[in-house]
């Protein structure tokens, strides 16, 4: 059950005067108690950041995509910690790329910055390197940029929890893309809100495995290009070198040490004599980073992105790939802890039944690019309590039920017998999973 739905007030047992860098009501009593047992490395990082950027990061509450990256017209409602699931080509990665693209468009549209506000340009031409696709036509649903005499508008609109909205529409005349604001009301953004957006950026971490055996020094522009191209594992040492030069490598090392017996020990590069960046980790003795295990490297990459990029919204694409089940659970633990202690939003895409079964059903959100509205299970009123009553229904069952859309969970009118409700709901769920027809009922 979602702890926010507890009958007790979240945070009610917190000692007076305690300081929190995330809202206790957002995560519930259990999460708060866990966070107070000892200060985590993430929490230490959050305290340090609060000295320079006291305002908390933004959280996305609504994403609308129309005629873009395979989406016809869908509105997605993510939570603070959301595990996105769905079939191949359902749109999980496309959704993440679209959100990242919206951030790019916001920066491109900045016309001028004033003391109290930032003014956006109504329209901009977009160069190919700015697009999240190899070819311009790939941005549009089925590559259709024109119908008859009308150019088709590809649209992205995002709403944040504080009411801020931004929206962009793209057209593709003459083989290139142009962008315009969807509404003139989006032209002016209060300065303090814009600064929060840029201080805590949206960061997309593509799926990757391991590291390359040798890594050359890269320029910042080349690093961004490789990450955008899904080759983040090729620049991990470069990011660690940046942190070493900034005096922040210890932040990564401290987090890693909480989860593994070894941690990052040394990062070095001398331009006059070195061709490659050297990174070692210490576990009894020093070892080259290339010899580390897959789980260590995956967690190291995620933590490095969290420290280096300072995201307010972290989007992670299949971080479980090729990992043992226990390491998949560890990745979820690290991301959930980061969300809680750093106060950031995490969107995680996965195919892993291990992860689906490990997380709370309320954290699941099934992505289907052909559906009009996409909400997490926790946003469907009453669904969690009914699922709880089923006992043996786990998150994998919940995912299959949602994905098939064959289950109608309803209150048992006039019944005060929980076991009766559970029995009827269980029978409905069995019929739901086995049925191949019937109405497509939603919660």
Descriptions of predicted regions:
Residues 98-165, 268:
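Conserved P-loop NTP-binding catalytic core
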Residues 208, 350-353, 412:
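A short beta-strand-to-loop transition that corresponds to the Sensor-1 phosphate-sensing loop
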Residues 1-110, 255-256, 266-400:
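Switch/communication elements of ASCE P-loop NTPase nucleotide-binding domains
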Residues 404-443:
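Conserved helicase/translocase motor-coupling segment
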Residues 70, 90, 208-212, 414-415:
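Short, solvent-exposed loop/turn segments at secondary-structure junctions
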Residues 119-122, 127, 167-261, 268-269:
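Coupling/switch segment of ABC-type P-loop NTPase heads
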Residues 71, 159-163, 261, 282-284:
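Glycine-centered tight beta-turn/hairpin loop motif at sheet-sheet or coil-to-beta transitions
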Residues 198-202, 311, 360-362, 404, ...:
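Short glycine-/polar-rich loops that comprise or flank the Walker A/P-loop
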């Amino acid at each position: 059950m979602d702890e926010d739905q507890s009958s007790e007030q979240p945070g009610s047992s917190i000692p007076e005067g305690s300081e929190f860098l995330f809202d206790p009501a957002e995560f519930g009593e259990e999460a708060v108690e866990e966070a107070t047992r000892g200060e985590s490395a993430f929490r230490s990082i959050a305290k340090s950041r609060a000295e320079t950027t006291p305002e908390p990061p933004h959280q996305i509450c609504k994403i609308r995509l129309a005629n873009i990256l395979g989406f016809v017209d869908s509105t997605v409602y993510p939570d603070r910690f959301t595990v996105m699931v769905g079939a191949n080509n359902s749109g999980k990665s496309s959704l993440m790329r679209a959100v990242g693209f919206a951030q790019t468009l916001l920066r491109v549209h900045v016309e001028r910055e004033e003391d109290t506000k930032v003014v956006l340009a109504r329209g901009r031409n977009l160069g190919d390197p700015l697009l999240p696709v190899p070819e311009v036509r790939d941005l549009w649903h089925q590559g259709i940029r024109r119908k008859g005499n009308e150019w088709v508008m590809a649209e992205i609109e995002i709403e944040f929890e504080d009411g801020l909205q931004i929206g962009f529409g793209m057209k593709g005349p003459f083989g290139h893309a142009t962008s315009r604001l969807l509404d003139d009301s989006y032209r002016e953004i209060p300065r303090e809100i814009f600064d929060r957006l840029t201080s805590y950026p949206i960061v997309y971490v593509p799926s990757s495995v391991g590291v390359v055996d040798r890594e050359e020094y890269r320029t910042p522009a080349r690093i961004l290009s490789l990450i955008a191209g899904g080759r983040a594992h090729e620049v991990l040492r470069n990011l660690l070198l940046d942190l070493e030069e900034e005096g922040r490598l210890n932040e990564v090392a401290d987090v890693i040490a909480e989860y593994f017996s070894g941690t990052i020990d040394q990062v070095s590069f001398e331009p006059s004599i070195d061709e490659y960046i050297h990174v070692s980790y210490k576990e009894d003795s020093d070892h080259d980073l290339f010899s580390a295990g897959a789980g260590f490297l995956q967690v190291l990459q995620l933590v490095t992105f969290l420290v280096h990029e300072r995201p307010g919204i972290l989007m992670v694409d299949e971080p479980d790939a090729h990992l043992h089940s226990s390491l998949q659970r560890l990745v979820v633990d690290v991301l959930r802890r980061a969300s809680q202690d750093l106060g950031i939003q995490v969107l995680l895409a996965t195919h892993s039944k291990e992860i689906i079964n490990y997380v709370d059903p309320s954290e699941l959100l099934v992505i289907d690019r052909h559906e009009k509205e996409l909400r997490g299970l926790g946003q469907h009123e009453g669904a969690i309590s009914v699922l709880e009553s089923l006992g043996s229904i786990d998150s994998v069952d919940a995912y299959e039920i949602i994905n098939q859309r064959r289950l109608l969970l309803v209150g048992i009118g006039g019944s005060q017998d929980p076991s009766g409700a559970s029995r009827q709901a269980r029978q409905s769920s069995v019929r739901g999973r086995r049925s191949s027809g019937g109405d497509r009922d939603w919660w």
